[in-house]
From Swiss-Prot:
Keywords: ATP-binding, Chaperone, Nucleotide-binding, Phosphoprotein, Stress response. GO terms for biological process: chaperone cofactor-dependent protein refolding; iron-sulfur cluster assembly; protein refolding. The modification Phosphothreonine is found at T198. Acts as a chaperone. Induction: By stress conditions e.g. heat shock. It comes from the Bacteria. One of its GO terms (molecular function) is unfolded protein binding. GO terms for cellular component: cytoplasm. SUPFAM superfamilies: Actin-like ATPase domain, Heat shock protein 70kD (HSP70), C-terminal subdomain, Heat shock protein 70kD (HSP70), peptide-binding domain. This is Chaperone protein DnaK. InterPro entries: ATPase_NBD, Chaperone_DnaK, Heat_shock_70_CS, HSP70_C_sf, HSP70_peptide-bd_sf, Hsp_70_fam. Belongs to the heat shock protein 70 family.
Length: 633
């Protein structure tokens, strides 16, 4: 069995880790970084860039650079959060045929699962390069507060990337695994996870290798991206006041503002003031305009204070659901890049009444936890038991549009529960089961996961037929629902696929596209390698011709020059095979030049040796001062 990797698929950055003996190890990517920006771009010539290369060109290609796509995963186009996102991002968010929110570049649409798959592919390649073997199984993390549609969409992303997703695990739970694996003490901990796009709080009990989640809460649309955009808005407003130009209408300027905001936010975690300097941000008839502004930590904290306060209520709810007080929490573990912000740490300290634990790397701890869970599933990590929970209540719509819960939130998973319902009308021969997830009392106010029909119920007065509805949640938090007529034994079941979501055919097509693109990327890489080798050979041959061309026969020199011209012509195209063939021809032709150079060198060396042979050894006398005796050579 090959290695199972652990992947933290983040909103802003992603990270991959693997078990190395008894410890989990974070793997560096091809750029030498331990985290990879969760950014995908499509260039003018259709090339796809992932990670740092995509981030580097974002300013000049804002409409085709997709970032923070995790916030769209498993969401409908008409979701209020998608409406909010559409106003904030420079790329186009469109409505897919299934009603989901997708992204578009140059008329080509991509599902958020597909974009996430490109990032997962990069993680997979990073692990394969490090391990020197194929990797096709992974544990992938998701925010604890992700609903069923978002979990299913993440699993689909893994499949498109060519990975069998053995387990979807919650990010705070993964962080707790990484924090508590080598600790002997038992107790209750809180994991406060404020990342790039989502916020989670989980309360866990740890002891003797058992990690039991007592409760979880959060907000799947609150994170570093919101802090960045708040600062972008402030900078744009200040610039408009000063210069009378609205930068929000300029996508290129907006992307530069976003990069500057992210940089300033990071700097203000370790310094009390920073300067934002963006020369030539825009221009009008009077000439170019520059943005220069000093920003203090206090000002930034005031701008984002309400965002930080938004994390407080979910923490209180999680404590209440777990049946513990803040004083009973032994340790608060900080996770996610935003938890580095001093103001965030101050709010956490006030809330829990203790200094938060800063002993874990907030950017890497989730991937490490995922790798540990991968080790558990592989049998490499022993005596660890993970008991997670479902974050939201599950149930069905009953008479009057009421939401009837069948599984309450914070129920340990995997779990299975049944409840018996009946018909609402006389002689009703079919019932429609509408499945919802959420905490509101009316079904319509919750997230609809899907629906199915149970047909062929025998005619009977209303209230007589007995229909047993069973909910089954697996260890990934993914839901199966079945309905059975107890009189006839007829059963109907669905694995919940959101009314949107990707069908098997969609996933299969995307898998094929990913494979085809991997082949195209490989060819493109081969062409670049071939071009580099060819360039090097042309340069060295031309240099050698200039210095030693007179030492070879005229016909041979002409053959070398012709081969150089042919190779230069081939270098204008992208045909790797043609470049390799012409490189080989030039290498063969230039061998004569090499022979002439070596022959000349050999003759020069021979002359030196001959000169040495003509040297006569001289006689010398060594005088010993003490004894005044003589030695002869």
């Amino acid at each position: 069995m090959g290695k199972v990797i652990g992947i933290d698929l983040g909103t802003t950055n992603s990270c991959v880790a693997v078990m190395d003996g008894k410890n989990a190890k974070v793997i560096e990517n091809s750029e030498g970084m331990r985290t990879t920006p969760s950014i995908v771009a499509v260039t003018d010539d259709g090339e796809r860039l992932v990670g740092q290369p995509a981030k580097r060109q974002a300013v000049t290609n804002p409409e085709r650079t997709f970032f923070a796509v995790k916030r769209l995963i498993g969401r409908r186009y008409d979701d209020p959060m998608v409406e909010k996102d559409k106003k904030l991002v420079p790329y186009k968010i469109v409505k897919a045929s299934n009603g989901d929110a997708w992204v578009e570049a140059d008329g080509q649409t991509y599902s958020p699962s597909q974009v996430s798959a490109f990032i997962l592919q990069k993680m997979k390649e990073t692990a394969e390069a490090h391990l020197g073997q194929k990797v096709d199984q992974a544990v992938i993390t998701v925010p604890a507060y992700f609903n069923d549609a978002q979990r299913q969409a993440t699993k689909d992303a893994g499949k498109i990337a060519g990975l069998e997703v053995l387990r979807i695990i919650n990010e705070p739970t993964a962080a707790a695994l990484a924090y508590g694996l080598d600790k002997t003490k038992t107790g209750t901990i809180a994991v406060y996870d404020l990342g790039g796009g989502t916020f989670d709080i989980s309360i866990l009990e740890i002891g003797d290798g058992v990690f039991e989640v007592k409760s979880t809460n959060g907000d799947t649309f609150l994170g570093g991206e919101d802090f960045d955009m708040r600062l972008v808005g402030y900078l744009a407003d200040e610039f408009q006041k000063e210069q009378g130009i609205n930068l929000r209408n300029d996508k290129l300027a907006l992307q530069r503002l976003k990069e500057a905001a992210e940089k300033a936010k990071i700097e203000l975690s370790s310094t009390t003031q920073t300067e934002i300097n963006l020369p030539f941000i825009t221009a009008d008839q009077t000439g170019p305009k520059h943005l220069t502004m000093k920003l203090t930590r206090a000002k930034f904290e005031a701008l984002v204070d309400d965002l930080i306060q938004k994390t407080v209520e979910p923490c209180r709810k999680a404590l209440k659901d777990a049946g513990v007080t803040a004083g009973e929490i032994g340790e608060v573990v900080l996770v996610g890049g935003m938890s580095r912000m001093p103001k965030v740490q101050e709010v956490v300290k006030q809330l829990f009444g203790k200094e938060p634990h800063k002993g874990v790397n907030p950017d890497e701890v989730v991937a490490i936890g995922a790798a540990i869970q991968a080790g558990v599933l592989q049998g490499d990590v022993k005596d660890v038991l993970l008991l997670d929970v479902t974050p939201l209540s599950l149930g069905i719509e009953t008479l009057g549009g009421v939401f009837t819960r069948i599984i309450d939130r914070n129920t340990t998973i995997p779990t299975k529960k049944s409840q018996v319902f009946s018909t609402a009308e006389d002689n009703q021969n079919a019932v429609t089961i509408r499945v919802f997830q959420g905490e509101r009392e009316m079904a319509a106010d919750n997230k609809m996961l899907g629906q199915f029909d149970l047909m062929g119920i025998p005619p009977a007065p209303r209230g007589m037929p007995q229909i047993e509805v069973t909910f089954d949640i697996d260890a990934n938090g993914i839901v199966n629902v079945s309905a059975k007529d107890k009189a006839t034994g007829k059963e109907q079941q669905i694995r919940i696929q959101a009314s949107g979501g990707l069908s098997e055919a969609d996933i299969e097509k995307m898998v094929k596209d990913a494979e085809a693109n991997a082949e195209a990327d490989k060819k493109r890489r081969e062409a670049v390698t071939a071009k580099n080798e060819a360039d090097g050979l042309v340069h060295s041959t031309e240099k050698a011709l200039a210095e030693h061309g007179s030492k070879v026969a005229e016909t041979e020199r002409r053959a070398i020059e012709d081969a150089v011209s042919d190779l230069k012509e081939a270098l204008k195209g992208d045909d790797a095979e043609a470049i390799k063939a012409k490189t080989q021809t030039l290498a063969q032709a230039s061998m004569k030049l090499g022979e002439a150079m070596y022959k000349q060198q050999a003759e020069a060396d021979a002359k030196k040796d001959a000169a040495k042979d003509d040297v006569v050894d001289a006689e010398f006398t060594e005088v010993d001062d003490d004894k005044n005796n003589k030695k002869s050579a």
